[in-house]
Amino acid sequence: MIRTLNIAHRGFSGMYPENTMEAFKKAVEIGSDGIETDLHITKDGVIVICHDETIDRTTDGSGFIKDYTYRELTEFNAGHGEKIPSLDELMDYMKDKNLLLNLELKNDVIPYENLERSTIDKIYEYGLKKNVIVSSFNHNSMQKVKKYDSSIKTGLLYGSPIHNPGEYAKRIGADALHPLFSLVMDKATINDIKRNGILINVYTVNEKSYMKKLIDLGVDGIITNYPNLLKDVIEKLTDK
Ligand code: G3P
Ligand code: MG
């Protein structure tokens, strides 16, 4: 029995415009176990979904999200005629599905003042506490989340090596580590993290050979642009 969770990175972003409702719905339709997505705050305090701090790369507009109102942002095309979604739209879609929702707070470049508090309020509003894991490259922010509510699950993102990651995560009170997958490709590292009681969700794994290796190593979740490929890999390993 393979228990590795299949988490769609920015939705099914390998085939549909990233971080759009289309990409989220396609991920759910093909049977992903969860969705990873990225959060920012508009000028008028609305949490919206986009990877970058600006809308230049992913829409037909330009400029910083923090300088637009939500209403203004909805005028832009995020691909296939899709709009930049609000967190409300995604949560409304997810609220009756028992799937994982990984909300990455994009507060490592712009320190959006109320992103933690506002995200937690949305989690309560939609009754999604048991489904959500909040993550960030900003580990101070994850400690702030725990101060507001210690029962909200948190994950520490990192893209370069850290010393004793399992012990570190435990010490600062996180539930999970979310490493760049190449940083945990050995059994000793995985075992060390698990010994500390910390979950491991790796990003971003788009090749089947790496998916197989990471499943074999026993990671808890794989974040991928191609949940269809990961589904294939899991099904084939299950058939054996
Ligand atoms: O949460 C995993 C992954 O999304 C972190 O990196 O830059 O794709 O948001 P990024
Ligand atoms: Mg992300």
Model-assigned labels for residue ranges:
Residues 1-240:
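Phosphate-group recognition and catalysis centered on beta-loop-alpha active-site segments
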